[in-house]
């Protein structure tokens, strides 16, 4: 009995504190993404395709979640990429995602198609197609 009373007496004076964790800041390492210029068989749309790709690249970099891979490092051409990416070529330059697309004249409008690929899984994540006037290209770039 004395033994039990001693244990109860000791337990009364034990102070229990919760474990406290303080996280001062998190770090997010930007994901490498390759953003190609939009491919077009029509040379008059080449500059517009470059402008759209540039705006998309700037938007993704400003988010802090992505870092663009320098397009001088690209192995596969835009023309061959419009069919199917060679994922091994993109793994060599250490990119995790690939954003490619095409731009075409469609009467007095343009059609813009984007495809986002996961390089390591070797599959398309998403694909979108937009149709707009040439003057509205910047708005489509921000979508």
Task: Tell me the role of every PLM-derived stretch.
Residues 20-23, 81-142:
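Amphipathic beta-strand/beta-sheet edge segments enriched in Tyr/Trp
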Residues 12, 34, 99:
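Conserved Rossmann-like nucleotide-binding pocket used by diverse enzymes
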């Amino acid at each position: 009995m004395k033994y039990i009373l001693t244990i109860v007496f000791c337990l009364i004076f034990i102070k229990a504190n919760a474990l406290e964790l303080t996280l001062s800041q998190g770090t997010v390492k930007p994901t490498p993404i390759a953003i190609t210029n939009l491919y077009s068989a029509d040379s008059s749309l080449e500059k517009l395709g470059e402008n759209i790709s540039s705006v998309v690249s700037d938007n993704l970099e400003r988010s802090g979640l992505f870092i663009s891979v320098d397009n001088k490092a690209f192995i596969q051409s835009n023309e061959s990429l419009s069919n199917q990416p060679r994922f091994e070529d993109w793994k060599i330059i250490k990119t995790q995602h690939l954003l490619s697309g095409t731009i075409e004249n469609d009467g007095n409008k343009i059609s813009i198609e984007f495809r986002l690929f996961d390089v390591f899984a070797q599959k398309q994540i998403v694909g979108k197609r937009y149709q707009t006037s040439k003057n509205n290209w910047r708005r489509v770039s921000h979508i």
